[in-house]
Amino acid sequence: TILGTGDIGCHVAQRMRSMGAAKIIGLSRSGKSREAVYDALYPIGDLDAVLCETELLVMALPDTAQTRGMLDRRRIALLPRQALVINVGRGTAIEQEALADALNEGRLSGAALDVAVPEPLPADNPLWTAKNLILTPHISGNMTLGYTCDANVEMFCTDLANYAAGRPLVHLVDRARGY
């Protein structure tokens, strides 16, 4: 299950498909995705029902008022014991203390967080000692790789050319949505 079906979520879905994932479910605000990489798509309102059946939850959410604390203690409890949680979006989407508790009590199989709040985590943060947790320092995006830099330059150049020609920009931030 991929929570967030934007560019990052779609990229994760494509990678999962190439590794033979049996069923890839996506959840988004609208229950839609720009790319046809999911076996099923649901609106965020169905999150609780989907979590009960989720073995692998990949979170690729932006930081908005709607996503902050989305995976809270109550929702973590909905996940099966064998579930794994991966967060590559924003650290604010997970109630970190609840995640650490669930891992330490064996209510989740494991987790991997590339993002947390704050970054870097203080030495006394309970995530450092949580069982079956992998922490990485916000590096999953590989922003230093050549193809990532090339893609960023290409996006900028496309919008610059559109701006100069009086055409609509492609890569706009919707301030009301927060991303």
Model feature map: region roles:
Residues I24-G26:
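Short beta-strand "acidic-cap" motif of Rossmann-like dinucleotide-binding folds
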Residues T1-R17:
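Glycine-rich adenosine-cofactor-binding loop
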Residues Q82, V88-Y179:
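Rossmann-like dinucleotide-binding domain for NAD(H)/NADP(H)
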Residues A22, G31-P126:
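Rossmann-like adenosine-cofactor binding region
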Residues G9, K32-S33, N142, Y179:
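Flexible, glycine-rich phosphate/dinucleotide-binding loops
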